[in-house]
């Protein structure tokens, strides 16, 4: 279960350590160790020590060892971020109540800024994501797939439905491929910020984050704005 105290941008992505709940203590420690050391360098001995558990106890809870533990932590953490992404998506883009054409850029920008802020709000999770990107060749494929399915793919599917609805309302021209429009939107609003901030490890100045996000939305609308539709 998640802690609701995210004042420092980290607690919201950590499992809560319940009294006597050794599995939660191990997961909590694993989240910190994987976020700090990455998948390859993290060791079962270190995780067990930080959890105050023996390696035997750890394997009793996670028989698959490091791979199973990493998958469990990533699925849980990705689920937390996914839920918050969907809350923010539905807040700013409701396909049942589409924005007026003149308000579309405003609403897309509000969504983009809310999503980019997740890198700060969920620092622990994005520390894990940063390590996944740098160590993808060493992380088991099933772990990568479980992470994608727990979070990014679900968000992408819901945004794709909304992109299609906006196109149906004449607000966007997705050129018959709302999934591709979704992929482009997500990259344009966040990729440069993620790269420059190392996935939120070194946050950019607020004004630079706002500028890059605005440029991303404007670039998206130049490619997919309904005004580009042939008449």
Which positions does each model-derived feature cover?
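Solvent-exposed, amphipathic alpha-helical segments
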Residues: 25, 29-37, 91, 114, ...
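Short, basic, alpha-helical segments at the C-terminal edge of helix-turn-helix-like DNA-binding modules
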Residues: 74-81, 87
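Amphipathic alpha-helical packing segments from all-alpha helical-bundle domains
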Residues: 82, 106, 120-133, 141-169
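Hydrophobic/aromatic-rich alpha-helical bundle segments in the mid-to-C-terminal region
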Residues: 145-149, 153, 164-216, 228-231
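N-terminal intrinsically disordered/low-complexity leader segments
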Residues: 1-21, 83, 89-93, 228-231
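Hydrophobic alpha-helical connector segments
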Residues: 85-125, 178-182
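Helix-turn-helix
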Residues: 25, 29, 33-75
